[in-house]
Amino acid sequence: MGIRAIVVDTAGTTTDLNFIQDVLFPYSVKALPDFLEQNQHNVLVENCICDTRDIALEPDADLARVTEILQQWVSEDRKATPLKTLQGLIWKQGYAHGEFKGHIFPDFIEAVKRFSEQNLRIYSFSSGSVDAQKLLFSHSDGGDLTEMFNGHFDTRTGNKLDKQAYCNILNTISLSPKQVLFVSDVIEELKAADAAGMMTCQMVRDSKQRTGEFRTISSFDELLIE
């Protein structure tokens, strides 16, 4: 049957986690107050504000309180969809203004080109919004990589720790589980993908990283698909 598609995690796998934590997250925290104030009547932003109130169980929270909630979620690394949507919108401004470029590991930049030449389908699955993923790969320090991808998945597909999310991906891309390889640095995500029947591989870029029973690689250079 063989592998026909590769689904990659982002932070820690294709992207340095430090770029997310030290550049993108602080930027979104700093920009949130002004962004919400200036865009609160935009339909998408307004929906995110309402969803934040609902999730926080604070239906009467004013804009300042909503901002506090969102900033707290960033510090807790919460995977709440309204936060991830707003972060994507804020980062779009940052990329557009040239305030940073998306960090992508060089070995993935080379590998994604190789996979594309092999006619393998490439997808990304992240807790960051689809828009944020597209921004990361289109404004990367390796150039625009978006044409190499066949699609992106985020929290709307499901929680990355839940088997059902990977079943949903399989249904969307219409491939059988053994035709799809999921690559991530997080053991719990690999367990969920494995439970859905997917092939799995753990990216171990740090020698101190926790590993399990999964096949491991330290670079995409080691991932050879026949």
Curated annotation (Swiss-Prot):
CDD domains: HAD_EP
A Pfam family matched in the record: Hydrolase
GO BP, one annotated term: L-methionine salvage from methylthioadenosine
EC number, as in UniProt: 3.1.3.77
SUPFAM superfamilies (UniProt xref): HAD-like
InterPro entries tied to this protein: Enolase-ppase_E1, HAD-like_sf, HAD-SF_hydro_IA, HAD_sf
Domain of life of the source: Bacteria
One MF term in the entry's GO annotations: 2,3-diketo-5-methylthiopentyl-1-phosphate enolase activity
Record pathway: Amino-acid biosynthesis; L-methionine biosynthesis via salvage pathway; L-methionine from S-methyl-5-thio-alpha-D-ribose 1-phosphate: step 3/6; Amino-acid biosynthesis; L-methionine biosynthesis via salvage pathway; L-methionine from S-methyl-5-thio-alpha-D-ribose 1-phosphate: step 4/6
Role according to the record: Bifunctional enzyme that catalyzes the enolization of 2,3-diketo-5-methylthiopentyl-1-phosphate (DK-MTP-1-P) into the intermediate 2-hydroxy-3-keto-5-methylthiopentenyl-1-phosphate (HK-MTPenyl-1-P), which is then dephosphorylated to form the acireductone 1,2-dihydroxy-3-keto-5-methylthiopentene (DHK-MTPene).
Known partners and oligomeric status: Monomer.
The protein's name in its UniProt record: Enolase-phosphatase E1
